[in-house]
């Protein structure tokens, strides 16, 4: 963005990201045009507002950049209005009982504090725009809005305490998070023979293992070569999307592993975790594996957790 935007527009965008200032529509138009040009250069044909409804999974609607110009042809177009707000059908998403289905209207709104990215697939590329999802009256219909509101409330309360402690040079305080994702890898042919794994992501019946941690694939043990190939491919995809993968290793149970990215602001870390889990499953399939993210896929051996290393971080770098 710094290379593509006028200096005044870029500074205005940074004030919105860092300080929460309202975004002027002229700035939004310039940002949207720069994002469109960058995305098209990278092969993208569509854009999507990515949000996290109460289903517990990601959601997205792909829209083309092409727009008819009335002369029998089309142009690539992406305005600030389209960047800031989208309107998916809210009737098919859970609301927690906030409203009846026939009144369900939903809006996505761009979250400028989380970087946009381009998702490449065998069938093309899409500009993905992290967003919130809300009702027309502003009620949160997703899991990102409560996180952003919690961060804002924490910042406001902490500022008062820091001022009393003499830390007046601190302008903002944010939460940071480094999540450790544990997972199991099993051969795809074994997963395909188990309807419970395919449907529930875990085993519902079976015999206890003969041994657990007594094999050589124990905690911090040598990583099997086939798994190492998967990990290298997977982490390469993470780096391409700006996800700072830091550590990977064998976990306690046989066939269990862990990936731990470097800590980031909690909002970005949360977005990156959703993306990480999606990439983990698709990359595992490309290597003949089936990835299990269920917290307890097998009885009698350790389950998979996601430790959150959480802290409060000031704009001056103090924990």
Where in this protein do the model-derived segments appear?
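Active-site core of metal-dependent hydrolases
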Residues: 1-105
């Amino acid at each position: 963005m710094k290379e593509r935007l006028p200096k005044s527009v870029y500074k205005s965008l940074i004030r919105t990201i860092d300080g929460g200032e309202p975004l002027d529509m002229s700035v939004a138009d310039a940002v949207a045009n720069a994002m469109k040009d960058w995305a098209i250069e990278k092969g993208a044909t569509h854009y999507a507002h990515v949000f996290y409804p109460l289903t517990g999974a990601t959601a997205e609607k792909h829209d083309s950049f092409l727009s008819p110009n009335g002369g029998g042809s089309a142009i690539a177009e992406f305005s600030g209005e389209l960047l800031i707000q989208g309107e998916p059908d809210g009737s098919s998403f859970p609301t927690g009982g906030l409203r009846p289905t026939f009144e369900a209207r939903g809006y996505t709104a761009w979250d400028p504090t989380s970087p946009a990215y381009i998702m490449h697939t065998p069938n093309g590329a899409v500009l993905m725009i992290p967003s919130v999802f809300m009702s027309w009256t502003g009620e949160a219909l997703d899991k990102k809005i409560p996180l952003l509101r919690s961060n804002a409330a924490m910042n406001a309360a902490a500022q008062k305490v820091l001022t009393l402690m003499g830390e007046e040079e601190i302008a903002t305080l944010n939460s940071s998070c480094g999540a450790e994702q544990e997972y199991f890898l099993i051969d795809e042919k074994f997963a395909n023979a188990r309807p419970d794994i395919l449907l529930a992501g875990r085993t519902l019946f079976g015999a206890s293992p003969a041994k657990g941690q007594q094999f050589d694939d124990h905690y911090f043990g040598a990583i099997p070569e086939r798994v190492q190939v998967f990990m290298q491919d997977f982490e390469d995809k993470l780096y391409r999307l700006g996800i700072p993968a830091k550590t990977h290793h064998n976990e306690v149970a046989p066939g269990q592993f862990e990936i731990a990215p470097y800590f980031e602001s909690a909002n970005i870390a949360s977005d990156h975790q959703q993306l990480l889990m999606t990439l983990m499953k698709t990359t595992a399939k490309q290597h003949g594996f089936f990835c299990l993210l269920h917290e307890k896929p097998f009885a009698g051996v350790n389950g998979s957790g996601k430790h959150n290393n959480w802290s409060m971080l000031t704009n001056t770098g103090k924990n």
